[in-house]
Amino acid sequence: MTPDCAFDAIADGYDSQFTETTIGATMRRAVWSRCADRFAPGSRVLEMNCGTGEDALWLTRRGIQVVATDISQAMLQVARSKLAASPGGAAAHFRRLSWEELGTLDEAPFDGVLSNFGGLNCVSDLRAAARSLATKLRPGGIAMLCMMGPLVPWEWIWFLAKGDPRRALRRLRRSGTQWSGVTIRYASIAETRRAFAPEFRTLRASAIGVLLPPPYTERGMSRFPRAIKTLNRIERRLETVWPLPMLADHYLLELERV
């Protein structure tokens, strides 16, 4: 199965399975909090792997001009419908585009870019992606990259307790893991920083889901909403404290185009 078909297949159920879940929504709000500090109203932001448009909707509501891209036509259709149905009819420009095709986008320069929740984990050549992205951002522009990390104690404990060591340790495989024909790689923070240098310098790295449990634990953990709120509150205070970012389900890198 090709990457576009793989994501087409999950488009209709993505929001119910992640976006609208307690844990998924909590993690997304943590990313939004950082984006609010980096993207000013009126700025132009490129969103890569926009999925069902939840981030594009939030950005446009803040007065940000958004060009939102994804490899999946089905995801883009959900995103277009979501924005059209929103109060006031929020508007973004949608494009079918993969990371590998970024060089063909002719709407640069942008003030910022957002790649949320693991889109870059599906890219085989981070260095090539970084070079392409550098041509689309103005000097001083900000890249917000939220990626799945390789070292996740929550995952080890969860799947080992279920007697599934293969899934517990899947992120440690250097060759990546396979999902519906897509290779998913789990680059460390250090590896991603190296791939994006020298065009980008790192401003901040934070943990998204280190005390919070991973989204796939939703069925069991949603029974404890107060615990999730407490864990999130503590996590937000400690999100940049080393080594928490490198032990999180996702890490958020904030990079500046030099």
Per-segment meaning from a language model:
Residues 181-200, 205:
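Short alpha-helix
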Residues 194, 204-258:
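A C-terminal cap/extension of S-adenosyl-L-methionine-dependent methyltransferases
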Residues 111-125:
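A short SAM/SAH-binding and catalytic strip from SAM-dependent methyltransferases
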Residues 127-139:
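A short glycine-rich, Lys/Arg-flanked "PGG" loop and its adjoining helix->strand segment in the class I
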Residues 1-40, 54, 58, 142-171:
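Conserved class I S-adenosyl-L-methionine
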